[in-house]
């Protein structure tokens, strides 16, 4: 089996990576940085996001698994002291593939420039270049829904619903549901201007089109990458036809992860 290990880059993560690679020697495992069948992320969720984007061109052929060396590893289900056991499991090759939904993003421009296409594992946000009020028309399935005024909009996946979306008051959605969630960022609501004021959960056959009314230079953040787009006509968000594949060697229940990340203080019975 072809593999690659992506490290956070700190001493602890690099040490674990080197130890894992040493154990892979003289086995059927072949290190391949271009076309790996399994990618091991050693670090935090940010490291796994980087690994995901690095290999986003071959999602149907690559599975991901994470060892977390930081404080919070929502995607990484293995602890540093379990890395030897993980290597043995990988060498045995007996694992289940779990698939999570992704966001497909298309940025359309007013000039002759071709649309740019992106994919997100956690979320995508849309704001103005200078952090002024974003004024944008929101359409759902081709029908106008509202005119939004506020700091911006966040579109998240079910697995990403536990990240920035949660801080914005959005719902937590189980990754088995193929959906995206649209959540407002500090919307303006008064007697003159009105938005729905609640997160919207859109199924896979719906799409969301956001059209800036005044601002044409838009800042988008797609997972960990922020990009400036000039002369933006609209941005379309929908559930991607592609999915991320996780290699599961043992149960890793979503709601237990939520509990352990946000509720547990380590003293639960």
Curated annotation (Swiss-Prot):
Listed GO biological process terms: NAD metabolic process; NADP biosynthetic process
InterPro entries: ATP-NAD_kinase_N, ATP-NAD_kinase_PpnK-typ_C, NAD/diacylglycerol_kinase_sf, NADK
Gene3D superfamilies, sorted: Probable inorganic polyphosphate/atp-NAD kinase, domain 1, Probable inorganic polyphosphate/atp-NAD kinase, domain 2
Protein residues bound to NAD(+): 45-46, 122-123, 149, 151, 186
Cellular compartments annotated: Cytoplasm
Keyword terms of this UniProt record: ATP-binding, Cytoplasm, Kinase, NAD, NADP, Nucleotide-binding, Transferase
Disulfide cysteine pairs (residue numbers): none
Keyword Lyase carried by entry: no
Domain of life: Bacteria
Reaction(s) the record says it catalyses: NAD(+) + ATP = ADP + NADP(+) + H(+)
Cofactor annotation: a divalent metal cation
Gene Ontology cellular component terms for the protein in this record: cytoplasm
ATP-binding recorded as keyword: yes
GO MF annotation list: ATP binding; metal ion binding; NAD binding; NAD+ kinase activity
Record-listed E.C. numbers: 2.7.1.23
Catalytic residues, chain numbering: 45
Family: Belongs to the NAD kinase family.
Function statement: Involved in the regulation of the intracellular balance of NAD and NADP, and is a key enzyme in the biosynthesis of NADP. Catalyzes specifically the phosphorylation on 2'-hydroxyl of the adenosine moiety of NAD to yield NADP.
Name listed for the protein in its UniProt record: NAD kinase
Organism, scientific name: Staphylococcus carnosus (strain TM300)
Source organism phylogeny: Bacteria, Bacillati, Bacillota, Bacilli, Bacillales
Gene: nadK
